[in-house]
Amino acid sequence: MIIALADLGDADVQALIAFHQQAMQAGSPPGLSFALDLSGLADPVVSVWAVRVDDRVAAIGALKLLGGGQAELKSMRTHPDFLRRGIAAQLLEAIIDHARSQAITRLSLETGGGPAFDPALALYRKRGFVNGAAFGDYVLTDFNQCLHLTLV
């Protein structure tokens, strides 16, 4: 397994990004999916990683710098062929390590609720993320929730 900054021009990376965005839109009430598309992930304040296993893109994840020592975890997605292998947990650790190296003191994320989101929520909570207040432009709803991890 290799975790490295992603080449957003790579067709396999683009396909997993598109799959993630489609799944988030399909599994969220109208107007409550905030998954970034390829152009959003290309923003200079966003870093995107890809995990490769046997030369296949197994997962992606991104970190968006928010300023003031804060950053947002974005676009975490494991390809269906690679689920339940611990890949997402290793990718999450790599992103957290990078955040620390950038002097980030709080890492936040916004996600949905319900069965489709339970595996991701379990991963984040196991790593120490806790539910909290909305951040940025997000608004908490019956569907959306925000989680935070203090980095020291």
Which sequence ranges carry the predicted segments?
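Acetyl-CoA-dependent GNAT
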Residues: 1-70, 74, 79, 92-93, ...
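C-terminal "cap" of GNAT-fold acetyltransferases
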Residues: 6-9, 105-127, 132-152
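Generic recognition of short, well-ordered alpha-helical segments
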Residues: 15, 90, 119-122
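Flexible, active-site-proximal loop/turn residues at the rims of small-molecule/cofactor binding pockets
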Residues: 67, 82, 113
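Active-site acidic-Proline motif in GNAT/NAT acetyltransferases
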Residues: 79-81, 85
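Residues forming the Rossmann-fold NAD(P)(H) cofactor-binding site
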Residues: 85, 89, 93
